[in-house]
């Protein structure tokens, strides 16, 4: 099986090297981002970033789920990002 694949690649490389090179570059473009450390950190940042930002409301004391101030820390901390 490996011999047939090697023979096929050798034959295609001899006939159409531009196509083989473009498919190789496209394959690397699909595979390499998953191995990049930037992908890891961007996923961590996206998980820690809230989708819904607090809206300033007048607190009458009966809203336990609304923060008292819009800048009160909520959710996961991003301290790990500051220490990089």
Swiss-Prot record:
Record region (Disordered): 56-84
Domain of life of the organism encoding this protein: Eukaryota
Any Pfam family: NADHdh_A3
InterPro entries with a match to the protein in the record: NDUFA3 (IPR026626)
GO CC terms in record: mitochondrial inner membrane; mitochondrion; respiratory chain complex I
Record-listed N-acetylalanine modification sites: 2
Main location: mitochondrion
TM regions (residue ranges): 18-38
Signal peptide start-end: none
Bilayer topology: Single-pass membrane protein
Keywords: Acetylation, Electron transport, Membrane, Mitochondrion, Mitochondrion inner membrane, Respiratory chain, Transmembrane, Transmembrane helix, Transport
Subcellular location(s) per record: Mitochondrion inner membrane
Record text on subunit structure and interactions: Complex I is composed of 45 different subunits.
Function description: Accessory subunit of the mitochondrial membrane respiratory chain NADH dehydrogenase (Complex I), that is believed not to be involved in catalysis. Complex I functions in the transfer of electrons from NADH to the respiratory chain. The immediate electron acceptor for the enzyme is believed to be ubiquinone.
Family of the protein in this entry: Belongs to the complex I NDUFA3 subunit family.
UniProt protein name: NADH dehydrogenase [ubiquinone] 1 alpha subcomplex subunit 3
Gene name of this polypeptide: NDUFA3
């Amino acid at each position: 099986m490996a011999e047939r694949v090697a023979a096929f690649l050798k034959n295609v490389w001899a006939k159409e090297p531009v196509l083989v090179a473009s498919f190789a570059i496209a394959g690397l473009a699909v595979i390499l981002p998953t191995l990049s450390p930037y992908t890891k950190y961007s996923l961590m940042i996206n998980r820690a970033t809230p989708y819904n930002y607090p809206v300033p409301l007048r607190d009458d004391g009966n809203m336990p789920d609304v923060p008292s101030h819009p800048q009160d820390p909520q959710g996961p901390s991003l301290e790990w990002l500051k220490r990089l």
